[in-house]
Amino acid sequence: MRFHLLLCVALIFAAQARTEDLVLKIAPVNTSFDVKGQAVKITAWGAVSSGPQQQFKLALTADLSDLQDNLGALLASQLNRSDRCGERLSVERATLVPASPAAVLTAHVHYERWACVKAFGREVVKRLVGGNAVLTVKLTPSAGADGISMAAEVQKIEADGSLGELLRSGSLGTTVKEKIASSIESSIRKGLDLKSTLPPAVAAAATLRAAQFVSGAEGKLWISVDGEVHISPAQFQSLNLKR
């Protein structure tokens, strides 16, 4: 009787050890989204591994280098506007580099504000302010039940005169900062869509906990995301058997 009891205990520990040794590798998955007719590709890969107390850890990495290469077009699609009697804004060029756990975005923009007035029966269009500016924005990602979020902090604004004041203290600077953050956040959400990246059973039980930008191959921008997968050891073993 004692022998059988010891055998059962040994089998339980052996099964637990086998579960703890298993790692479910997530093969690279390519997703893409359109920016002005150009397909921007994001490649994501990762693994699910066992942790303490039968918890399973999720680790994902996404290569954002194609997003870096098409950043100017992405921001232009969200920020550019040309109102005849109002604001005209164009993104001339932009860069995004890793500064783990954040990333630093530098945008070169041209801005003008125009007003239309009627004089002597005709409309006169007059430029009120205009010039070039360089904005440096720190982007810090986070992750939670709702997915990836992005916080933006303006670190530096280079602009002369009244344009500098508009960007530093007016609503223009806030609007630009918020649109930059939402553009990058939306792009990463599309590239790290759990339903398309993970097996269905894992995606349905996954919760993201943390995210950070990291420097990948050749200094390219990657994002690393950690989380948990709430499945039983039996489900985890079943997923490995199906590979």
Give the positions of each predicted feature.
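Bacterial N-terminal signal peptides
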Residues: 6-13
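Extracellular/lumenal and peripheral-membrane lipid-interaction modules
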Residues: 18-243
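Positively charged n-region of N-terminal signal peptides that target proteins for export
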Residues: 1-4
